[in-house]
């Protein structure tokens, strides 16, 4: 789960991480009032959407007086920002962060991520702050420094100091930088983050180390023990189909293709997408109905797939281990009738009660194309979609 920058900064502040003072605003008048309350000579007006690249898209403006705050708030609120992370459709700006300006001396990057290769959290840092870390990794990888963190003991002070020296934090500010990184790590662990990224981390003319931006992502599977974080969820920033899918415990991720996929199990779902691509098709989604799919869940899965106007056909690929193929077959038939499906539908069943499942499909009288294997099903749906 993602949260907004201002929410992430509030979380980090509670862990002793230094961030600029700021206030969220939902209207132009609130933005002006927030700037008044901050009482600083310079304010930064920042669009709040779940995407990076806001500055390049015109979503971050420096205001030197209240009139400029009003002008920038009017120009940003309600507009659609298109960045490299939003896709061509962009995201509408519904809230702003009004923040005090900083006398920036130098920008850095600091982030915590999970390294799946080592099964450890890794602290990454670079003196090339303010730019995409992927770009730094591609062009100047030698400027990225890493510290792998033993989960048994956590981030150690010497590791944070080594990072600070490697990225050339001024010696007199190393102590602050170490405190910053230790606080960031505590937030990452205690709040079950999957990413904690500060870009940029800055040193200021006043001799401070601060987070000028904050990106926190959380492990959705751990949200049951973080009610405070769950309350920060902004449904306006999420795909409506993903929200609907979550209501029925369906794992749905939209893609750009035209072949809808309904599969049980994440591994089989990925294999299904791969084989569709192998036969020159394009999957429209990843949809895992899980191990205990009912007729209701199958029906809802169909509705979610069909809500994507790009879908021209559906491939149902089920291995009946925990669930039974006859139950899935009945669910597919019920769903087909309920939604009045007119698109090509290919169904491949294998596993428990597979013969009964196939019999139910064959005797349904519906235009359902049966497949004998995953490859057969992929070829058939690609051919039918054209």
Curated annotation (Swiss-Prot):
Residues binding substrate: 264, 321-323
UniProt keyword terms in alphabetical order: ATP-binding, Ligase, Magnesium, Metal-binding, Nucleotide-binding, Tricarboxylic acid cycle
A cellular component term, taken from the record's GO annotations: succinate-CoA ligase complex
Molecular function via GO: ATP binding; magnesium ion binding; succinate-CoA ligase (ADP-forming) activity; succinate-CoA ligase (GDP-forming) activity
Cofactor, how bound (note): Binds 1 Mg(2+) ion per subunit.
Annotated residues for binding of Mg(2+): 199, 213
Pathway(s) of this molecule: Carbohydrate metabolism; tricarboxylic acid cycle; succinate from succinyl-CoA (ligase route): step 1/1
Keyword hit for ATP-binding: yes
Reactions that this protein is recorded to catalyse: succinate + ATP + CoA = succinyl-CoA + ADP + phosphate; GTP + succinate + CoA = succinyl-CoA + GDP + phosphate
NCBIfam families: PRK00696.1, sucCoAbeta
Annotated protein name in UniProt: Succinate--CoA ligase [ADP-forming] subunit beta
Protein encoded by which gene: sucC
